[in-house]
Design a protein with these regions (language model features):
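Conserved glycine-rich Rossmann-like NAD(P)H-binding loop of the short-chain dehydrogenase/reductase
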Residues: 15-31
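Substrate-binding pocket helix/loop in short-chain dehydrogenase/reductase
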Residues: 84-86, 93-96, 182, 193
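Alpha-helical segment proximal to the catalytic Tyr-Lys
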Residues: 114, 160-161, 221
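Active-site helix of classical SDR
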Residues: 109, 147, 155
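Residue(s) in the substrate-gating loop at a strand-loop-helix junction
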Residues: 131
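C-terminal helical subdomain
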Residues: 171, 192-223, 230-232
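Short, small/polar-rich loop/turn modules that mediate ligand/substrate recognition or access, typified
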Residues: 163, 168, 223-225
Length: 319
């Protein structure tokens, strides 16, 4: 009823699809359905606890009773939980996050697939909203990542089950997206997430909705078993601290990357800090190549000017 789920429901409604909204919050869920209808769409709301398989079965049954058939299911409900080493989680945390993020998706797929098959719908679809954490695990996110890896795995396996019946099964894997999962995070935290992404911004829920609409459409009938990131290249690979753009910082005569390294190694205070983090660094070319990332921290501690730090990091990349 919020964030990505709301954006998908509204996008589907605006594009002529009959939509059944399901959420725990009656107020929020009904507001989404009413908004779709106010714009000329066709939508109803059914209050549902999406962490319970029995509730999802009832949701599917009511949907078929109201509309006569079911063409597709989007399983979006989920909760975040993280920032904690695995051993600090409680068993109750495990049960809570798996009941919604995994069991809820399983039930949506199970009862959704049954209803689609019984409806003899042409072009049926199952779309699961997973996460970039289901493609690339993140530190402190053991439980959340496990649930999302599970969603991606179920998606791919189910695609094999239903391909011959014309039912596509795909997962959308959002990266940092401006939704309520971030709660009341301060602006500085949001800026950090944006800066951590290669695209240097957070995603909008509507960008995930656009992909969901495509996957539900006739244009995507041969796309199945895919886990598609919507993440501004967050999962594409490791980011180097240095800039590939190489701004013109080496043309003012004196500064160049190799001399910057030499100057740093000649500074006793700098050498002490470097040795603290990276023993043997000053005389070890392989260490210089391997630990460019750590130099960002060292440079900040030493108060290096940004231009010198960039030059240094570029040199490390090429050692």
């Amino acid at each position: 009823s919020r964030g990505i789920g709301r954006a998908i429901a509204e996008c589907f409604g605006e594009n002529g699809m009959k939509v059944v909204c399901a959420a725990r919050s009656a107020e929020q869920g009904q507001a989404v359905a009413d908004g779709i209808c106010a714009k000329g769409g066709d939508a109803i709301f059914i209050q549902t606890d999406c962490s319970k398989a029995s509730a999802i079965k009832e949701l599917v049954d009511k949907t078929v009773a109201h509309y006569g058939k079911l063409d597709g299911v989007v399983s979006n409900a989920g909760i975040g939980m993280g920032g904690t080493p695995l051993h600090e989680y409680e068993v109750e945390d495990y049960e809570k996050i798996f009941s919604l993020n995994s069991e809820g998706v399983f039930a949506g797929m199970k009862y959704g697939a049954e209803a689609i098959l019984k409806s003899h719908s042409e072009g049926g679809f199952l779309i699961n909203v997973a996460s970039v954490a289901g493609l690339v695990p993140q530190r402190g996110q053991a439980l959340y990542s496990a649930t999302k890896f599970g969603v991606v795995g179920m998606t791919r396996a189910a695609a094999l089950d239903y391909a011959e019946y014309g039912i596509t099964v795909n997962a959308i894997c959002p990266g940092y997206t401006k939704t309520s999962i971030f709660g009341d995070a301060p602006a500085a935290a949001m800026d950090f997430f944006a800066s951590d992404c290669p695209a240097k911004r957070m995603g909008d829920p509507e960008e995930c909705a656009a992909l969901a609409l495509f996957l539900a459409s006739g244009m995507a009938r041969y796309i199945t078993g895919a886990a598609i990131p919507v993440d501004g290249a967050l999962s594409a690979g490791h980011q180097s601290v240095s800039s590939w753009k190489h701004p013109e910082i080496l043309t003012d005569g004196k500064l160049n990357s190799q001399s910057t390294i030499a100057a740093l190694m000649e500074n006793e205070a700098a050498k002490a800090v470097v040795e603290q983090y990276l023993p043997g660094f000053a005389d070890n070319q392989q260490a210089k190549a391997a630990y460019g990332m750590t130099f960002g921290k060292i440079g900040s501690m030493l108060g290096l000017p940004e231009t010198a730090l960039k030059a240094l990091l570029d040199a490390l990349d090429n050692l």
